[in-house]
C-alpha cells in the first residue's frame, strides 16, 4: 500500500513539473510585454500581451485565419485598461480592465473589448463583449517579425494605439 501511494505521488509530481515546464517553454517564445501611456485628465492606459514571432510563417489568413476571433497575442488573452471614461476608436469606454480580441480581415478588422479578463487566450465568450468596432488594416512595406503594440502619446492628449505584425498595421486613436 505504501509503495502504491509513493508511486502515485511521484507520478503527480512529474505531471506538475511537466506542466510548469511547458508553460515556461511557451512563455519564453512569446514573452510578456507591458505598456503604459498617459493622456489628459488622469487618463492612464495599460496593455499587457504576449509577443509571438513569425518564424518564417504566413500569419494573417493562414496561422491567424481571417474572419475568426483571435486573442490578439499569444498565451493569456491580451488585456487593456483605462483609468477613466475615454474614446477607444470612436467608441466610449468606461474605466476598467478588458480583454482585447480581434477578428482579422484582409482590409478591415473588428476590434473587441470583452469584460472577462484573466482567461487563457482561447476561452472567448462573446456574451461578455463590452464593445465592437471596425478599423482599417494598412499594409506595410516593412515586415514586423514579432507582434508589436505601441502606445504613442500625441498632441492634444491623444494616444495612438498601434498593432504591427507581418505586413499589417492597425491604428486606434484614444482620447
Predicted regions and their residues:
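Structural motif
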Residues: 40-41, 88-89, 165
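Hydrophobic membrane-insertion alpha-helices, especially the h-region
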Residues: 6-21
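Short, exposed beta-strand-loop hairpins at the edges of beta-sheets
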Residues: 158-166
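Mid-length scaffold segments of soluble, non-membrane domains
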Residues: 72-118
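Short extracytoplasmic
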Residues: 39-66
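Surface-exposed, gly/pro-biased binding rims or lids
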Residues: 118-158
Amino acid at each position: 500500500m505504501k509503495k502504491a501511494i509513493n508511486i502515485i505521488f511521484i507520478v503527480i509530481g512529474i505531471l506538475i513539473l511537466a506542466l510548469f515546464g511547458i508553460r515556461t517553454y511557451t512563455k519564453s517564445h512569446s514573452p510578456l510585454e507591458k505598456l503604459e501611456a498617459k493622456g489628459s485628465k488622469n487618463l492612464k492606459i495599460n496593455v499587457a500581451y504576449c509577443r509571438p514571432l513569425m518564424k518564417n510563417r504566413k500569419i494573417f489568413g493562414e496561422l491567424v485565419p481571417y474572419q475568426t476571433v483571435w486573442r490578439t497575442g499569444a498565451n493569456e488573452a491580451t488585456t487593456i485598461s483605462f483609468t477613466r471614461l475615454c474614446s477607444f476608436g470612436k467608441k466610449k469606454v468606461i474605466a476598467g480592465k478588458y480583454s482585447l480580441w480581434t477578428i482579422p480581415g484582409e482590409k478591415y478588422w473588428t476590434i473587441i473589448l470583452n469584460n472577462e479578463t484573466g482567461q487563457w487566450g482561447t476561452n472567448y465568450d462573446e456574451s461578455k463583449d463590452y464593445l465592437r468596432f471596425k478599423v482599417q488594416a494598412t499594409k506595410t512595406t516593412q515586415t514586423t517579425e514579432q507582434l508589436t503594440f505601441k502606445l504613442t502619446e500625441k498632441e492634444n492628449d491623444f494616444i495612438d494605439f498601434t498593432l504591427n505584425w507581418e505586413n499589417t498595421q492597425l491604428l486606434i486613436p484614444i482620447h
